[in-house]
């Protein structure tokens, strides 16, 4: 079983397209707000465990095992967000941090039951796709920057940024 810290690194690698491309330690350092030597050390541990591969001067990317494990973490996180909103009546700006804590602590059986309880949803409350069968492709990738002022759009995906969610909730 991986530590929370290692799982957070795997998610950071995937978030920075590390399923297809190499991600530099500098990018991970900035993304995670962690000093570069610490990133290098953790990447070494993840590589030794078989979750990532590294290439000198290119960076790190997820292996097949690393991607499988990372998608499982994301599935847990997104199901928890939905559960917290739909069942426990949390506000959507509150759920990300709660899910961050809980995603590392629930069993596979709990995830299966949660998925069933929620009727096998396709997306989390923020519009992020819930991975299934080791597949992960976001549905909503067009940004609002692609539209002109006055265009009528429906927002289907927002990032889990607390300040943004609070702002949107107030409108």
Regions flagged by a language model, labelled:
Residues 58-77:
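Basic, amphipathic "hinge/linker" alpha-helix immediately C-terminal to the N-terminal HTH DNA-binding motif
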Residues 43-44:
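Short, hydrophobic-biased segments on the C-terminal half of alpha helices
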Residues 47-55:
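A short, conserved structural fragment
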Residues 104-171:
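Mid-protein regulatory/catalytic core that forms ligand/cofactor-binding pockets
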Residues 75-111:
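Ordered, amphipathic secondary-structure segments that act as subunit-interaction surfaces
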Residues 2-34:
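N-terminal helix-turn-helix DNA-binding core of bacterial DNA-binding proteins
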Residues 37:
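Key DNA-contact positions within bacterial/archaeal DNA-binding proteins
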């Amino acid at each position: 079983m991986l530590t929370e810290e290692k799982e957070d690194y795997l998610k950071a690698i995937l978030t920075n397209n590390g399923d297809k491309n190499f991600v530099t330690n500098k990018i991970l350092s900035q993304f995670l707000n962690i000093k570069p030597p610490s990133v290098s050390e953790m990447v070494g541990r993840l590589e030794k465990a078989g979750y990532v591969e590294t290439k000198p001067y290119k960076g790190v990317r997820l292996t097949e095992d690393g991607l499988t494990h990372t998608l499982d973490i994301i599935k847990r996180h997104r199901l928890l967000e939905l559960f917290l909103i739909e069942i426990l009546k949390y506000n959507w700006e509150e759920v990300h941090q709660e899910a961050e804590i809980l995603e590392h602590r629930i069993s596979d059986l709990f995830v299966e039951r949660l998925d069933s309880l929620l009727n096998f949803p396709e997306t989390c409350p923020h519009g992020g796709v819930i991975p299934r069968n080791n597949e992960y492709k976001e549905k909503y990738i067009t940004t609002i920057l692609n539209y002109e002022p006055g265009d009528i759009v429906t927002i289907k995906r927002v990032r889990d940024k607390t300040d943004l969610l609070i702002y949107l909730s107030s409108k």
